[in-house]
From Swiss-Prot:
Disulfide bonds: none annotated. Signal peptide: none annotated. It comes from Pseudomonas putida (strain GB-1). Belongs to the RuvA family. InterPro entries: DNA_helicase_Holl-junc_RuvA_I, Hlx-hairpin-Hlx_DNA-bd_motif, NA-bd_OB-fold, RuvA, RuvA_2-like, RuvA_C, RuvA_C_sf. Keywords: Cytoplasm, DNA damage, DNA recombination, DNA repair, DNA-binding. Residues 1-64 are annotated as: Domain I. GO terms for molecular function: ATP binding; four-way junction DNA binding; four-way junction helicase activity. Residues 65-143 are annotated as: Domain II. Has three domains with a flexible linker between the domains II and III and assumes an 'L' shape. Domain III is highly mobile and contacts RuvB. It is found in: Cytoplasm. This is Holliday junction branch migration complex subunit RuvA. NCBIfam families: ruvA. GO terms for cellular component: cytoplasm; Holliday junction helicase complex; Holliday junction resolvase complex.
Length: 205
């Protein structure tokens, strides 16, 4: 089991990364909440990981915080929730927001995540309620996203990367493009910032 990687961020193509550890490149998929916190390509990075072994592939998922990884593990234990849906849920909602939804049994945000209908949201919240009794929300422990703008990137490539990342989460290409187009004052924003703002707009609308 690979539990943590520490190395150099070699590539960043949302939602995928490659981390170079002593000359070996590890490819990972990460939730957007982790993506927002990553350093620039070429800088040192540490991520907590979860390995999924399938017959046709070994898939590695990365997280900025241990609690993100624990949440991911709780989600994929649920009936009908695979890694893709778990990452979509975690990308649309910060950890503390998802925990509060579970505690309040509030489906309103969950149903805006691709692949989650009302019945599915209700079932997930019920199944997670007992598991989350020990999870207390704390801004200091759970706030994973800063409020400031992220580094500037090429406008055309940033928008294309953002659309691609949203599609990988399950949104339709038209929905993704529309969400990016709806962002005000987006000139010069990084793909990470575009993804963050578009997800916030779609989940909280």
């Amino acid at each position: 089991m690979i539990g943590r990687l520490r190395g150099t961020l070699a590539e960043k193509q949302p939602p995928h990364l490659i981390i170079d550890v002593n000359g070996v490149g590890y490819e990972l998929e990460v939730p957007m909440t982790t993506l927002y916190r990553l350093p620039k390509v070429g800088e040192a990075v540490t991520v907590h990981t979860h390995l999924v072994v399938r017959e046709d592939a070994h898939l590695l998922y990365g997280f900025a915080e241990k609690r993100e990884r624990e949440l991911f593990r709780e989600l994929i234990r649920l009936n009908g929730v695979g890694p893709k849906l778990a990452l979509a849920l975690m990308s649309g909602l910060e950890v503390d927001e998802l925990v509060r939804c579970v505690q309040a049994q509030d489906t309103s945000a969950l149903v805006r995540v691709p692949g989650v209908g009302k019945k599915t949201a209700e079932r997930l919240l019920v199944e997670l309620k007992d598991r989350f009794k020990a999870w207390e929300t704390s801004p200091a422990m759970f706030t994973l996203v800063s409020d400031g703008p992220l580094p500037v990137a090429s406008e055309s490539s940033a928008e294309a990367d953002a659309v691609s990342a949203l599609v990988s989460l399950g949104y339709k290409p038209q929905e993704a493009s529309k969400a990016i187009a709806a962002i005000k004052d987006k000139a010069g924003l990084s793909s990470e910032e575009l993804i963050r703002r578009s997800l916030k707009g779609m989940i909280t609308k």
